[in-house]
A protein has these predicted regions:
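Short, exposed beta-strand "edge-strand" segments with a Pro/Gly-rich flavor and a Y/T-containing core
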Residues: 7-13, 87-92
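Beta-strand segments within the central parallel beta-sheet cores of soluble alpha/beta enzyme folds
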Residues: 14-24, 75-79
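Interdomain hinge/lid region at the active-site interface
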Residues: 28-89, 93, 100-103
């Protein structure tokens, strides 16, 4: 969602139009509806803190390693979110991931 909204903005597309187009199809979800609107309005109030999201991803990464799995997408998401915590975004909601792309 964050990548799609970043792309839309870079191409001069309206984020609300994008969300409306994808939300009614297979890509739609409650998370998209809820977090997408918050991102577009700049509402980063936490429903779930970024710092807790990273903690949970670290637990998942540890369990994956214990199982002998290499979960590249998890590792990339964890790295991206950790960089936001390093920038002081740990107390924001996980929708603040958009800030990673707004560097």
């Amino acid at each position: 969602m964050c990548e799609a909204l970043t792309y839309a903005k870079a191409e001069g597309l309206d984020g609300n139009t994008l969300l409306g187009a994808v939300s009614t199809g297979a890509a739609g979800s409650k998370q998209l509806d809820f977090q997408g609107k918050k991102i577009l309005t700049g509402d980063f109030a936490p429903g779930f803190f970024m710092k807790h999201f990273v903690k949970d991803m670290r637990l998942a990464e540890e369990e994956a390693e214990n199982a002998g799995l290499d979960l590249n997408v998890l590792q990339q998401a964890l790295s991206n979110c950790q960089s936001l915590i390093d920038r002081g975004c740990g107390d924001l909601g996980n929708q603040a991931l958009i800030k990673f792309y707004e560097k």
